[in-house]
C-alpha cells in the first residue's frame, strides 16, 4: 500500500475526468519510478482502458484541455497513444490505451498492438519491472510486476522472460544497462546473462535509436565498462574487440592496455559535472584506430600506434 506524492493538479484534474466517466487511468512508467526514488519526474505519462476515441470524448469535455489532432496525432493513434495539451504546460502529454503486443515488424522497430483490458496486461509488455508500475491520482502505487520490491532490493530486472523481452526489442538490453549505471543498481543475474547471450541482436537496431540510447549510457559512471563487459559495444564497433591485447608504453600510459586506458579515461570523464553526450562520443572515438595501426615493439615489450 505504498503511497507517493500525487501528480500535479493539472494532471489530477484530467485523471478525475476519466474516473468520473467510468474509466481507469494511471500515471505510468518513469514518473512512478522517479517518485519512489525521491526524484522529480521530468514528465507524466498516463495510461487508461479508454480507447483513443473515448479519450478524445473525455478530453473534449474538460475545459482548458485539448486533444491534439494532425499528422503527429494520427500516427500516434496507430500505437493507441493520444496527445493532450494541458493548462500551464508547453508540452503535450501522452495518454496511451492499455495495450498488449501481438508481435513486431522490422526488428522492433514497430510493435503491433491491440487494446488490453487491464493494466496488468499492459505491464506484461514493458521492458523492466521498475518501469512497469502505475500510480493512481491520489498517489497509490499499482505494481503487478514487482518493480517496487526490485527497487527496494536495488536490482534491475526484465519483465517476465528476459530473453523474450530482448528478442522483441534489442534496445531493451541497452536500456537495462542505462538504468543500472544511472541509478547504481546491479542487473539481475538472469537478465544480465540474457543480455550477454543476445548482444548480437543490437546490430539490427537503427543508428538513430542506438545513438540516443548509448549516449545516455556513456555519460554515466561505469557505462562504458558495462557496454564492454556485456559485449554490446564490440558488436556495434569491432574496433573495440580484444582491446586488452594492445599494450601501451608504460612511460606514457601506466594503466597499460588500451582497454584499461579507456576505462580510466571514462572514469575521469564521468567526474565532470556538466559532461555532455557529445563529449562522451568524442572520448569513445579518440583512440578507436589504435588497433588498426598497432605494431609490436619486441625490444620494449609494448605496441606503437603510428598512423
Name the predicted role of every residue range.
Residues 1-307:
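Catalytic cores of the polymerase beta-like nucleotidyltransferase superfamily
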Amino acid at each position: 500500500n505504498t503511497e507517493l506524492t500525487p501528480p500535479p493538479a493539472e494532471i489530477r484534474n484530467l485523471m478525475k475526468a476519466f474516473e468520473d466517466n467510468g474509466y481507469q487511468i494511471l500515471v505510468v512508467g518513469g514518473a512512478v519510478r522517479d517518485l519512489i526514488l525521491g526524484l522529480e519526474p521530468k514528465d507524466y505519462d498516463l495510461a487508461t482502458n479508454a480507447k483513443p476515441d473515448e479519450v478524445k470524448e473525455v478530453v473534449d469535455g474538460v475545459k482548458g484541455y485539448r486533444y491534439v489532432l494532425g499528422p503527429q496525432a494520427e500516427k500516434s493513434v496507430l500505437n493507441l497513444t493520444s496527445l493532450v495539451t494541458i493548462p500551464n504546460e508547453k508540452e503535450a502529454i501522452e495518454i496511451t490505451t492499455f495495450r498488449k503486443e501481438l508481435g513486431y515488424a522490422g526488428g522492433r522497430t514497430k510493435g503491433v498492438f491491440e487494446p488490453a483490458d487491464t493494466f496488468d496486461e499492459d505491464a506484461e509488455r514493458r521492458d523492466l519491472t521498475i518501469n512497469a508500475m502505475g500510480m493512481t491520482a491520489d498517489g497509490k502505487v499499482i505494481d503487478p510486476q514487482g518493480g517496487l520490491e526490485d527497487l527496494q532490493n536495488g536490482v534491475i530486472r526484465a519483465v517476465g522472460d528476459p530473453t523474450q523481452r530482448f528478442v522483441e526489442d534489442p534496445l531493451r538490453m541497452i536500456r537495462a544497462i542505462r538504468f543500472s549505471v544511472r541509478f547504481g543498481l546491479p542487473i539481475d543475474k538472469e537478465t544480465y546473462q540474457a543480455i550477454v547471450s543476445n548482444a548480437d541482436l543490437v546490430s539490427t537496431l537503427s543508428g538513430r535509436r542506438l545513438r540516443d540510447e548509448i549516449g545516455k549510457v556513456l555519460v554515466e559512471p561505469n557505462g562504458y565498462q558495462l557496454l564492454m563487459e556485456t559485449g554490446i559495444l564490440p558488436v556495434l564497433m569491432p574496433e573495440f574487440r580484444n582491446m586488452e591485447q594492445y599494450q601501451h608504453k608504460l612511460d606514457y600510459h601506466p594503466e597499460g592496455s588500451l582497454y584499461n586506458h579507456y576505462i580510466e579515461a571514462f572514469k575521469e570523464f564521468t567526474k565532470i559535472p556538466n559532461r555532455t553526450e557529445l563529449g562522451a562520443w568524442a572520448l569513445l572515438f579518440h583512440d578507436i584506430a589504435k588497433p588498426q595501426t598497432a605494431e609490436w615493439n619486441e625490444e620494449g615489450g609494448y605496441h606503437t600506434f603510428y598512423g
